[in-house]
UniProtKB/Swiss-Prot annotation:
Gene3D superfamilies attached to this UniProt entry: Cation efflux protein transmembrane domain, Cation efflux protein, cytoplasmic domain
Source organism of the structure: Synechocystis sp. (strain ATCC 27184 / PCC 6803 / Kazusa)
One of the GO BP terms on file: intracellular zinc ion homeostasis
NCBIfam families (alphabetical): CDF
Keywords: Cell membrane, Membrane, Transmembrane, Transmembrane helix, Transport
InterPro entries for this protein: Cation_efflux, Cation_efflux_CTD, Cation_efflux_CTD_sf, Cation_efflux_TMD_sf, CDF_Transporter
The keyword Transmembrane appears for this protein: yes
Protein name (record): Uncharacterized transporter sll1263
Upper lineage: Bacteria, Bacillati, Cyanobacteriota, Cyanophyceae, Synechococcales
Amino acid sequence: MTARLARPYAVLSIGAALATMGLKLGAYAITGSVGLLSDALESTVNLASAIVAFWALSLAATPADSEHPFGHSKAEYFSSGLEGAFIFVAALGIGYSAVERLLSPRPLDQNALGIALAIAATALNGTVAWILWRAGKRLNSIALRADSQHLMTDVWTSVGVVVAVALIFVTGWEWLDPLIALGVGFNVLWTGTHLLRETISSLMDQSLPPAQLQAITSCFLPYEDQGVRFHLLQTRQAGSQSFISFHVLVPGHWTVQRGHDLCEAIETAIAERITGSRVTTHLEPLEDPKSWQHPDEFPPSAPLNRDKPN
């Protein structure tokens, strides 16, 4: 459901990428600045990334089936992973153009219209990035957040290029143009590295952030006075979905119905705090020593009450 709600924002990103790419190419054609050309090349990456994000969100919105019982929400990571690869390719192209211009410099055409077009493209990118960031946070979509972060990097890069071109017009220092283009290339490369690292961490089933782990354990506290204990908390993030599992240890004299009602109440409380979560519980008797023997258990990332009964 969340991925389906995010798709219109991916369409917005595609439209914005097409518009900004046209504006920046127009600015390059007027000024001849390789810095603006590098900025336009990065916009092609934005366009490709937006298209991939739309595809990934469409796939992530596909309901779970017999072959994919946990759903398709991890498809969002295809977007950030491929975006990182696109960014590396763009960085190489930017670096090549900058070195070529550094070795064979030529004067820029002084035209205020070119800079005005670049400023308009930057303003459009900034607005769309802000919209995508808010939507990504609200819908817990890593694809939208990654697209927003990339666009904001593009915004700051564009600001630097526009300022540099203006300075060149004032000072006449033509060598600033390729140097700034190289700086843009390194900035794009850093963005690609950051996105790839985030994607790899997510694909390795990284646990939920500490704040969310604390929200989960806070749901346990009201039941500890009843002699209930909890352990083996395991969490992972998969796109816009969070998967949470833990064991619930209750007194052995409890009925199955009472234990079931307790688990239902806890699962509901967690679902209200963690948007898009799927909670799985395992009920165990508190007095049975085997309930405490789990060789694969590791120290949890958040405090759990694991005290054995006296």
